[in-house]
């Protein structure tokens, strides 16, 4: 097995702890549970995200929700039910909601300011889709100097086709997590790996 870039740079392999982190939940929107953008494995991933959110709330972890706005009439229309956050992980009063338009949740949003205001260097990241907004937000966190942990089973994606090759959702999910784990963040299989 290859040596990761994290190992070469001497970065910690220790997952984040809930009490010393901020939780960033990305794009758990209804659009990923039905219709043209439905993801494979969204239901168990959403269950894992709900468990993660409940545990974070119990630990007093700051929570930031991120949603993508594709504009009126799109599958990401946050003014319509399709673009809203799924009820299983809906924000509570006092939990920030960041609206983004790019895969990197830090681009042209207040996420960085909210993360800094929460006062935690470490982030815990989970969301939809693994290969897109989760990957690029983990990269964004890394580039701004945060230490991130990504929860694999709370993420999901969809199958794609490229260069006459079908890429299954599990393969794409695993490939995205490998990219993240090579440099941008610690990747853990489940929330069981997180200390309180």
Which role does the model predict for each range below?
Residues 1-22, 51-54, 74-196:
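Active-site-adjacent betaalpha module
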Residues 25-26, 61-68, 151:
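Short beta-strand segments at enzyme active-site cores
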Residues 29-34:
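Short acidic, Gly/Ser-rich segments with clustered Asp/Glu that frequently serve as metal-coordination loops
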Residues 35-44, 124-130:
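Short, glycine-rich nucleotide/cofactor-binding loops
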Residues 36, 72-74:
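Glycine-rich, proline-tolerant flexible connector loops at the mouths of alpha/beta enzymes
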Residues 37-65:
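A short alpha/beta connector and helix-capping loop motif
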Residues 68-69, 128:
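Short, well-ordered beta-to-alpha junction loops that form the rim of enzyme active sites
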């Amino acid at each position: 097995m290859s040596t990761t870039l994290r190992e070469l740079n001497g970065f910690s392999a220790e997952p984040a702890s809930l009490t010393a982190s901020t939780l960033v939940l990305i794009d758990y929107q209804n659009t990923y549970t039905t219709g043209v953008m439905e993801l494979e494995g969204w239901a168990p991933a959403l269950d894992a995200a709900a468990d993660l959110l409940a545990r974070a709330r119990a630990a007093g972890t700051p929570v930031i929700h991120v949603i993508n706005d594709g504009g009126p009439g799109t599958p990401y229309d946050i003014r319509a039910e399709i673009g809203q956050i799924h009820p299983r992980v809906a924000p509570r009063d006092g939990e920030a909601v960041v609206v983004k338009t790019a895969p990197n949740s830090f681009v042209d949003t207040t996420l960085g300011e909210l993360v800094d205001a929460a006062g935690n260097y470490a982030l815990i990241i989970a969301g939809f889709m693994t290969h897109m907004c989760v990957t690029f937000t983990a990269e964004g966190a890394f580039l701004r100097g945060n230490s991130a942990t990504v929860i694999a089973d709370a993420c999901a994606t969809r199958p794609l086709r490229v260069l006459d090759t079908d890429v299954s959702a599990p393969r794409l999910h695993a490939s995205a997590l490998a990219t993240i784990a090579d440099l941008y963040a610690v990747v853990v299989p489940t929330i069981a790996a997180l200390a309180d």
